[in-house]
């Protein structure tokens, strides 16, 4: 989203009614599928995300389904700044291939060397269901699922296996009201659940 010069005249730059379905992405660099950054990101710097914020600046009617991402350099699938996004029936295999010191050669520059499988960022009431993620490569996250800095994320009926960072992370203080139920984890490494500074 580009920042509008005259927001009152042109309206807010945001995504509505986006559907990504039936795609096969292979050997991309930083992301497999990502929707959609916001030029108003500073407005979302809080734990409890009010509906009014999404009414004004959030993305609406985001649907990501039946996609397959493999051999991705970073994250598999991420939805950002969205109200009630639905992410279902997606599969990922061998993601985070570039999250290592060959690509991030400065040890003190930790910022970009993180990736997870299928996850929302700064979204509200995100539903992620019937997804599968396998073989997330080791990095500073590397979990299949990541309830990251959002309000009301629900993971249910997902299947993860052989992910080097584990099954799920509840990431940082601004990830609240999350639920993780009826999911199956098989041979995920590095621990099943990572609270990572989460208050819940």
For each of these PLM feature ranges, what is it?
Residues 2, 35, 79, 120, ...:
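Extracellular beta-strand solenoids
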Residues 1-13:
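Extracellular beta-strand-rich solenoid/capping regions of secreted or surface-exposed proteins
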Residues 4, 37-39, 83:
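Active-site-proximal loop/turn and secondary-structure-junction residues that shape catalytic pockets
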Residues 14-30, 43-75, 83-107, 114-117, ...:
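Right-handed parallel beta-helix
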Residues 9, 76-77, 169:
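A generic structural signal for short coil/turn motifs at secondary-structure boundaries
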Residues 6-8, 115, 142:
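Extracellular loop and loop/strand-boundary signature of outer-membrane beta-barrel proteins
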């Amino acid at each position: 989203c580009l920042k509008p010069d005259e927001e009152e005249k042109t309206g807010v730059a945001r995504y509505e009614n986006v559907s990504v379905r039936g795609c096969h992405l292979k050997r991309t660099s930083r992301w497999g599928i990502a929707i959609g950054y916001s030029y108003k990101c500073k407005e979302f710097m809080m734990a409890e995300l009010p509906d009014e914020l999404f009414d004004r600046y959030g993305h609406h009617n985001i649907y990501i389904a039946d996609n397959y991402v493999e051999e991705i350099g970073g994250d598999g699938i991420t939805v950002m700044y969205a109200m009630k996004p639905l992410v279902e029936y997606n599969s990922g295999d061998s993601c985070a291939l570039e999250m290592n010191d060959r690509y991030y050669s400065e040890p003190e520059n930790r910022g970009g060397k993180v990736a997870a499988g299928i996850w929302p960022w700064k979204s509200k009431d995100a539903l992620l269901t019937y997804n599968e993620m396998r073989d997330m490569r080791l990095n500073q996250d590397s979990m299949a699922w990541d309830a990251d800095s959002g309000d009301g994320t629900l993971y249910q009926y997902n299947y993860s296996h052989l992910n080097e960072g584990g099954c799920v992370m509840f990431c940082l203080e601004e990830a609240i009201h999350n639920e993780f139920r009826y999911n199956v984890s098989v041979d995920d490494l590095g621990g099943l659940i990572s609270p990572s500074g989460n208050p819940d």
